[in-house]
């Protein structure tokens, strides 16, 4: 099944639902960063959460940054997701492994530890909206749901899942169901929705059982006036890094530092944290940057 995002509404627009399949992009992240099992689960859940949150933004080019900063051995998570369906991310310690938790599952909460969730929404106006909440469990799903209720005052049910086997990621994705103000006053409706979401064993078991996103929507909201939008959105792991950007960053170091790199290292190497791509800048590249800096200095002087 292709990585995709599908939207739906129910209860005359009082319920908003978004589902994502992120199996392939999570596997790509695992391979790029050489992630351990628990690191794959942690990053995969956070990427799915980022895409779900970004899906509610309106302006073209809008993006959301999700940073999980805990005191656990994973050493943090950073994800950048866009309304356009692109996502990238990394963890501080990609190779960490822990014993299973009390439920026999990957111990994402133990890897993350105690700390905070930071969310920055950039809607393209130059004034990003940021918010911080304390982590509830470190399992990502609970933490993002807590953020949505606390910071956006929107009752939300969020399921995230990543299944990692010996051959890699075989199922990953998530589901976000939000009760909007027009339906929040219907206590019976809210109770029914909470009961159904609570009865689910998780998101990845549904995918492993062969369920599609429309089928999952029907199971949850089929008798609540469900409308599934026919357009699905393709999702993919994508990083906007480039050699030109690397040169721009190196140029900011200044002449003395660049000259030192030429003498000591015969060039420079840079690795993108988000995608793991390695860039090599030769001594000739660095020499040209020095020339550019000298030219700019003489012009401005």
UniProtKB/Swiss-Prot annotation:
GO molecular function, one term: unfolded protein binding
GO biological process: protein refolding
Database matches in CDD domains: Hsp33 (cd00498)
Keywords: Chaperone, Cytoplasm, Disulfide bond, Redox-active center, Zinc
InterPro entries for this protein: Heat_shock_Hsp33 (IPR000397), Heat_shock_Hsp33_C (IPR016154), Heat_shock_Hsp33_N (IPR016153)
Primary location recorded for the protein, binned into one broad class: cytoplasm
Post-translational modification: Under oxidizing conditions two disulfide bonds are formed involving the reactive cysteines. Under reducing conditions zinc is bound to the reactive cysteines and the protein is inactive.
Compartments in which it is found: Cytoplasm
Record's GO cellular component terms: cytoplasm
Chaperone listed as a keyword: yes
Disulfide-linked positions: 239-241, 272-275
Taxonomy, superkingdom: Bacteria
Family per similarity comment: Belongs to the HSP33 family.
Function of the protein: Redox regulated molecular chaperone. Protects both thermally unfolding and oxidatively damaged proteins from irreversible aggregation. Plays an important role in the bacterial defense system toward oxidative stress.
Descriptive protein name: 33 kDa chaperonin
Annotated source species: Nostoc sp. (strain PCC 7120 / SAG 25.82 / UTEX 2576)
Gene this chain is encoded by: hslO
């Amino acid at each position: 099944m292709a990585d995709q995002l599908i939207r739906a509404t129910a209860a005359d627009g009082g319920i908003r639902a978004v589902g994502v399949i992120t199996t392939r992009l999570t596997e790509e992240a695992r391979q790029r960063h050489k992630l351990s099992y628990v690191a794959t689960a942690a990053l995969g859940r956070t990427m799915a959460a980022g895409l779900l949150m970004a899906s509610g933004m309106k302006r073209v080019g809008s993006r959301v940054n999700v940073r999980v900063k805990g005191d656990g051995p994973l050493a943090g998570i950073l994800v950048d997701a866009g309304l356009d369906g692109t996502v990238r991310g990394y963890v501080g310690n990609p190779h960490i492994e822990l014993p299973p938790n009390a439920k026999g599952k990957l111990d994402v909460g133990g890897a993350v530890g105690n700390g905070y969730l930071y969310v920055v929404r950039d809607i393209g106006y130059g004034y990003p909206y940021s918010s911080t909440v304390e982590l509830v469990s470190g399992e990502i799903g609970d933490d993002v749901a807590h953020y949505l209720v606390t910071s956006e005052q929107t009752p939300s049910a969020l399921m995230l899942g990543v299944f990692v086997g010996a051959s890699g990621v075989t199922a990953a994705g998530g589901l976000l169901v939000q009760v909007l103000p027009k339906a929040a006053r219907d206590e019976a409706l809210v109770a029914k929705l909470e009961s159904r979401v609570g009865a689910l064993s998780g998101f990845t078991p549904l995918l492993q059982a062969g369920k599609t996103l429309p089928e999952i929507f029907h199971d949850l909201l089929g008798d609540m006036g469900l409308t599934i939008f026919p357009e699905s959105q393709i999702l993919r792991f994508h990083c906007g890094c480039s050699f030109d950007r690397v040169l721009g960053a190196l140029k900011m170091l200044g002449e003395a530092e660049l000259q030192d790199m030429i003498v000591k290292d015969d060039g420079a190497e840079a690795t993108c944290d988000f995608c793991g791509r390695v860039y090599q800048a030769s001594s000739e590249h660095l020499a040209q940057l020095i020339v550019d800096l000298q030219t700019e200095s003489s012009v401005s002087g």
